[in-house]
């Protein structure tokens, strides 16, 4: 590895980052608009009830009180949901940038060790306080990502975001599970039921735990340290419709020809693991199979 190779590598790796971050920020802005509209709706209904009480007293019930309260509660729940989605998007952007920054700093350090690049006279170091603040920002996100996914190899595509996590080499190797169709189907259903606590615990992070979903604590440092200085063995594959790295809990599609193979629970609306004998297809494969059935009937 030399300086020109590193430069070329990161020029390519970072070429799509601005578009990814811009997409995430646009999504956050869109959800902000939805939050504002929902707030206006429930505040208007609340004012309507208060106006009626001021006019008629507290003993007289508004003729549409139950309907209004139901609508207010519905909008408040929507606002909570949208706020959690905004946190997810913001942390996805944070992770994307942090991932590239960490690998870049790792390669720079290697070039300096090999005396291919002179070190900075006054290197900028991340203080322990900064590390703790960064860790807390991700720890605070754990509530909004409580239903997350266990990885498997998938085809790479342009990453576009919806959720986020750290790079970590998994205890389970799913490559061998797809050696034959019979073994693959069985292994797929077994892996789908694996929970986050069944994944190998990573090494601790110096500046604070980057806890995610309460059970899986991951950090960029620990993932790279466990897999070599350059993180060469780290799982950098992209999975799911959102085309992000594996994190948390994931579910595998039982269609052997599935394009994505593995999906984050939050991306496909899964909140609990499937039963032992349950077969699960992703929305894409399920739609294709339904079309095939209709064609056969015709």
Curated annotation (Swiss-Prot):
PROSITE patterns per the UniProt record, alphabetical: ZF_PHD_1 (PS01359), ZF_PHD_2 (PS50016)
Example GO biological process: filamentous growth of a population of unicellular organisms in response to biotic stimulus
Feature: compositional bias, Low complexity: 174-188
Keyword Zinc in annotation: yes
Polar residues: bias regions: 140-158
Keyword line: Cell cycle, Chromatin regulator, Coiled coil, DNA damage, DNA repair, Meiosis, Metal-binding, Nucleus, Zinc, Zinc-finger
Coiled-coil residue spans: 20-86
GO cellular component: cytosol; NuA4 histone acetyltransferase complex; nucleosome; nucleus; piccolo histone acetyltransferase complex
Binding site for Zn(2+) 1: 240, 242, 264, 267
Annotated SUPFAM superfamilies: FYVE/PHD zinc finger (SSF57903)
Location of this chain's protein in the cell: Nucleus
Positions contributing to Zn(2+) 2 binding: 253, 258, 282, 285
Residues with site note (Histone H3K4me3 binding): 239, 250, 254, 262
UniProt xrefs under SMART domains: ING, PHD
Source taxon at top rank: Eukaryota
One of the Pfam families matching this protein, by short name: ING
Ranges where the record places region Disordered: 140-206
MF terms in GO: histone acetyltransferase activity; histone H3K4me3 reader activity; methylated histone binding; zinc ion binding
Zn finger residue spans: PHD-type: 237-288
Function: Component of the NuA4 histone acetyltransferase complex which is involved in transcriptional activation of selected genes principally by acetylation of nucleosomal histone H4 and H2A. The NuA4 complex is also involved in DNA repair. Involved in cell cycle progression and meiosis.
Subunit-level organization: Interacts with H3K4me3 and to a lesser extent with H3K4me2. Component of the NuA4 histone acetyltransferase complex.
Family, per entry: Belongs to the ING family.
Free-text domain note: The PHD-type zinc finger mediates the binding to H3K4me3.
Name used for this protein in its record: Chromatin modification-related protein YNG2
Species for this entry: Candida albicans (strain SC5314 / ATCC MYA-2876)
Gene from which this protein is expressed: YNG2
């Amino acid at each position: 590895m030399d300086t020109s190779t590193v430069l070329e590598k990161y020029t390519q790796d970072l070429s799509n980052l601005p578009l990814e971050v811009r997409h995430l920020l646009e999504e956050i802005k869109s959800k902000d608009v939805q939050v504002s509209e929902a707030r206006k709706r429930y505040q208007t209904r609340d004012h309507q009830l208060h106006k009626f009480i001021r006019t008629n007293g507290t003993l007289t019930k508004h003729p549409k009180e139950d309907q209004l309260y139901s609508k207010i509660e519905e909008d408040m729940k929507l606002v909570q949901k949208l706020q959690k989605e905004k946190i997810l998007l913001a942390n996805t952007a944070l992770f994307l940038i942090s991932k590239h920054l960490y690998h870049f700093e790792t390669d720079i350090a290697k070039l300096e060790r090999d005396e291919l690049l002179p070190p900075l006279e006054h290197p900028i170091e991340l203080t322990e306080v900064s590390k703790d603040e960064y860790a807390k920002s991700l720890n605070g996100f754990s509530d909004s990502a409580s239903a997350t996914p266990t990885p498997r190899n998938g085809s790479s595509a342009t990453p576009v975001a919806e959720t986020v996590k750290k790079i970590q080499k998994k205890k389970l190797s799913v490559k061998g599970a797809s050696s034959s169709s019979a073994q693959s189907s069985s292994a797929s259903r077994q892996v789908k039921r694996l929970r986050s606590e069944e994944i190998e615990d990573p090494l601790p992070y110096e500046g604070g735990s980057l806890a995610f979903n309460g059970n899986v604590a991951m950090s960029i440092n620990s993932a790279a340290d466990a897999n070599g200085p350059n993180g060469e063995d780290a799982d950098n594959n992209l999975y799911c419709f959102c085309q992000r790295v594996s994190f948390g809990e994931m579910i595998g599609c039982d269609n052997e020809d599935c394009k994505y193979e593995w999906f984050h629970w939050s991306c496909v609306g899964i909140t609990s693991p499937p039963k032992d004998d349950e077969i699960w297809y992703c929305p894409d494969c399920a739609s294709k199979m339904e079309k095939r059935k209709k064609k056969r009937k015709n």
